[in-house]
Amino acid sequence: VFTTMKTHKLLFVTLLGTVCISCGHPSHKTGSEKEALGKLLFHDTSLSEPPGQSCATCHASSKGFADEQARAISEGAVQGLFSQRNSMSVCYAAFVPELHYDDDNENYVGGLFWDGRSPSLQDQAGIPLLNPVEMGNRDKQMVAEKVKRTPYYNRIVQIYGETEHCLL
């Protein structure tokens, strides 16, 4: 059981890290491989519950990686269910600082989502996957199992290995 839980956690961390890299973070010698893998993850509609919704569904490249819909709220993976707000652009998400109070400006700076509820890109990347309205997965284990069934899972293992540096 411990090994299975560790593997699921590693899968989840790898997924989040790869998606973050694909959104514009500088990479090392395997950067292009990581970017290609991130693109696959970003567009994979099998990672939602029910299948059919990907990150790209709400963050369209044709709209600056923001929602294509011109309404205040977005429909999630389940038809007829809407989130509390529309999807913002993820175009510069890799460059947003962690949420903090700036004494000089006497204001909060950074954080992701419209309300800053996610302090970092790494934290933000997993939230839609587990949101019951957005991508509908019940837990990290469910996401990890789906990732293991993808045709690109072996690429994840080749790039990150099956270690702590891997997966969710």
Regions found by a protein language model. Name each.
Residues 1-36:
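N-terminal export/targeting leaders of redox proteins
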Residues 23-168:
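Periplasmic c-type cytochrome electron-transfer domains
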